[in-house]
């Protein structure tokens, strides 16, 4: 008998046998601009094993490959060549059934004892419903963790030199470009720049120093907005002062005279108001004690000019005839000054009165003015003359 030789044909591992499943239609979608793209794709499948036909639909940008091929391999090949994304439209072929490698001997069969013993099932762990609810709550709490609150808008006051309106426009333009800035206000009188928004002060100052080429300082904010609080506190304080002053005025109205020991002089309390006397009493006034002997009054009024009637003046007699004009020149001593006042009198024709003259002052028998008549007015609103007034 002849010996039978078993011939085993070995093939290289790189080669793949075409699937024995028959012809497969692979539809792919990709971008094709023109017929040149279609010709290039057809050249790709010219030497591809298993491909029988290639169809291209330019309107819908679809490529159809017919043959005994692997759809995934065809898609990767096209995408690699044209350098564009390729989408596989048709369903992928089912995977191949892998045959176990032949070991040369009879296949081992499982022992009948192993087949008879069914697989032992482990008891499932019993879970309590309360534990599940707690776990779900924890997971939901972690997911629904409140996000961090957004940063609050703040106001930053910067101090820098402002020379002119050009500087102000430049600073506004630079600051408005910073992210988070809402508004910019400039106080040129105090050289202040007020910036409102969500700002990082540590990064803002060096940035402005570099851009403006000048020093920019941050004015520290007062604690708890001290300015408004101070203003609010000042308002009631002012009201309290006004109430106190009003009460003092009411008390001062009941004026009482007191006798001073030894001198016998009388002292009277006078309320002297300040500020708003004629304007409706708006200002605050204070009360003070005024003595008649201590009140100096106002300055001396200007010395008036006097017209003297015809007759003797300083012992000199001037005779006038009717129808003749006369003039007399009189020197009067100014009280308490040490110099002499000169007055020029003009008398008209007839009786000597060419012009209406004011009433003559008090004259004594010698015909000259009383020097005591030129002294300063008595004390303002004194006891002797409560309605008197001095001419300023």
UniProtKB/Swiss-Prot annotation:
UniProt protein name: Heavy metal-associated isoprenylated plant protein 6
Sorted UniProt keywords: Cadmium, Cell membrane, Lipoprotein, Membrane, Metal-binding, Methylation, Prenylation, Repeat
Positions contributing to Cd(2+) 2 binding: 164, 167
Signal peptide: none
GO annotations of cellular component type: plasma membrane
Chain's role: Heavy-metal-binding protein. Involved in the maintenance of heavy metal homeostasis and/or in detoxification.
InterPro entries in alphabetical order: HIPP01/3/5/6, HMA_dom, HMA_dom_sf
Domain of life: Eukaryota
Coiled-coil intervals: none
Lineage per the UniProt record: Eukaryota, Viridiplantae, Streptophyta, Embryophyta, Tracheophyta
Domain HMA, first and last residues per copy: 23-86, 153-216
Chain positions found as Cysteine methyl ester: 389
Record localization: Cell membrane
Binding residues annotated for Cd(2+) 1, in chain numbering: 34, 37
Any one Gene Ontology molecular-function term assigned to this protein's record: metal ion binding
Induction: Up-regulated by cadmium, Hg, Fe and Cu, but not by Mn or Co.
Biased composition (Basic and acidic residues): 1-19, 106-145, 258-270
Effect seen on changing residue 167 to G: Loss of metal binding
């Amino acid at each position: 008998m002849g010996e039978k030789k078993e011939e085993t044909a070995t093939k290289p591992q790189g080669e793949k046998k075409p699937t024995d499943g028959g012809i497969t239609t692979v539809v792919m979608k990709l971008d094709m601009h023109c017929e040149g793209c279609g010709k290039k794709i057809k050249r790709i499948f010219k030497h591809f094993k298993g491909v029988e036909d290639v169809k291209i639909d330019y309107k819908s940008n679809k490529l159809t490959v017919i043959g005994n091929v692997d759809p995934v391999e065809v898609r990767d090949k096209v995408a690699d060549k044209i350098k564009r994304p390729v989408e596989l439209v048709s369903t992928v072929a089912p995977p191949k059934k892998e045959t176990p490698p032949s070991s040369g001997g009879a296949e081992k069969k499982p022992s009948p004892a192993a087949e008879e013993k069914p697989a032992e099932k482990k008891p499932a762990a019993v879970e309590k419903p309360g534990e599940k609810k707690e776990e779900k709550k924890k997971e939901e709490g972690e997911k629904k963790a409140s996000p961090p609150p957004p940063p609050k808008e703040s106001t930053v006051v910067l101090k820098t030199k402002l020379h002119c309106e050009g500087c102000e426009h430049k600073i506004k333009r630079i600051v408005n470009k910073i992210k988070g800035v809402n508004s910019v206000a400039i106080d040129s009188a105090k050289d202040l720049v007020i910036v409102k928004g969500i700002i990082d002060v540590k990064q803002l100052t060096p940035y402005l120093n570099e851009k403006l080429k000048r020093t920019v300082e941050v004015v520290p904010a007062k604690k708890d907005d001290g300015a408004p609080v101070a203003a609010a506190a000042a308002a009631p304080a002012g009201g309290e002062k006004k109430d106190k002053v009003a009460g003092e005025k009411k008390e001062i109205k009941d004026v009482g005279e007191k006798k001073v020991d030894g001198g016998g002089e009388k002292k009277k309390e006078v309320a002297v108001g300040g500020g708003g006397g004629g304007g409706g009493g708006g200002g605050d006034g204070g009360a003070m004690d005024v003595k008649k002997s201590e009140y100096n009054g106002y300055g001396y009024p200007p010395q008036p000019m006097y017209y003297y009637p015809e007759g003797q003046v300083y012992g000199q007699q001037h005779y006038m005839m009717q129808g003749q004009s006369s003039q007399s020149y009189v020197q009067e001593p100014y009280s308490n000054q040490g110099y002499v006042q000169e007055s020029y009198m003009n008398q008209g024709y007839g009786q000597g009165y060419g012009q209406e003259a004011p009433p003559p002052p008090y004259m004594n028998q010698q015909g000259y003015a009383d020097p005591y008549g030129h002294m300063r007015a008595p004390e303002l609103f004194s006891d002797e003359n409560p309605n008197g007034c001095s001419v300023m």
